[in-house]
Swiss-Prot record:
The keyword Iron applies. This is 3-isopropylmalate dehydratase large subunit. Binds 1 [4Fe-4S] cluster per subunit. NCBIfam families: hacA_fam, IPMI_arch, PRK00402.1. Pathway: Amino-acid biosynthesis; L-leucine biosynthesis; L-leucine from 3-methyl-2-oxobutanoate: step 2/4. It catalyses: (2R,3S)-3-isopropylmalate = (2S)-2-isopropylmalate. It comes from the Bacteria. The lineage of its organism: Bacteria, Pseudomonadati, Thermodesulfobacteriota, Desulfuromonadia, Geobacterales.
Amino acid sequence: MGKTIAEKIFASHLVDEPFAGTKVLRLDVVMCHEITTPIAIADLMARGKDRVFDPTKIKAVIDHVTPSKDSKTATQAKMLRDWARRHGIVDFFDVGANGVCHALFPEKGFIRPGYTVIMGDSHTCTHGAFGAFAAGIGTTDLEVGILKGVCAFREPKTIRINLNGSLPEGVYAKDVILHVIGRIGVNGATDRVMEFRGSVVDTMTMESRMTLCNMAIEAGGTSGICMPDMVTVDYLWPFLKDEYQSREAALAAFSLWRSDEDAVYEQVLDFDVSSLEPIVTFGYKPDQVKPVSEIAGTPVDQVYLGSCTNGRLEDLRIAARILKGKKIAPTVRGILSPATPKIYQDAMREGLIDIFMEAGFCVTNPTCGACLGMSNGVLAEGEVCASTTNRNFMGRMGKGGMVHLMSPATSAATAIEGKIADPRKYL
């Protein structure tokens, strides 16, 4: 009987099986940021265990509230900063070099097919786009990961999501994943790996695959995952060229990390996206979705473009194509947060930042701040935001605020009209 990619990764990293169905895995990468990691650091220090298993396998960044907005967030940042220096963690990204973790770390080439990756952040599943098993974990597991380089997981069960057909104009990866979550629900993949397959995934860029995998957690998934292919190799090639003689050699090595044809899945779900419309959320859960045609005209106060879901260069290009030569509505605040310094610089070189600013957008430094209602775009009570982020929980971007999740294209069209709008009319 064949194995899924998740089963192969588990088998290759297995250290112990203390209980039936519980696997202790060796970790390839432990990621850390300044919101959750200081809690783990403080507990390890209190127990006299202030050490790390391997400083080369720990990647740390200050990204959630940066630069710090007050003494509390400054203290959190300092704690992570001091810890990284104390333990010789070279891959630490401080103010000026920092970006949103789930965009920055792939950009740095830290992820490979077949890797095991953890972080005290629920959207760690993003990195499954590279054919890795990547999962968000709690403080206790993070402490063990930092200290021992291992983490315990349940035996993986996989739901195969076949995405077939071809994407219509104006429809993107964000629309696809919102559609999938709308179909299966916020608990539809609880404790499962969501394996994304099909012709649509095959033709997606790595940026789009990261958008898909990023929101696996919004359906309850432990991780999202895609099969590594030449798209993966091309993205990683600047970091692989000293390890492999050719791209073809790298692809051959990565082909080990693909699900077998006779692998057994808990479920197989088929989606034909050929007639899919742009999708927008309407409530306080990511599975409350509607086609844009059914919600168009809803007024908004703010449009936010950024985050680990849709703050990459591809996303900025899509939105800028719609915004070029236009102005946002006078009733709307437009905020753009490129996800990393490199994305920001590349967008400047391409003239994208000029397009956003001429349209009336405020452009901030790379940060997660607005997404979780902490800085750089917090909503007032009763305000409504059209956002390219990944969560629309009540008060997520500010107490009493409402969030409509959508693609960068839909957010750009919405900014122009001051109300939720169909981007296809601008393409």
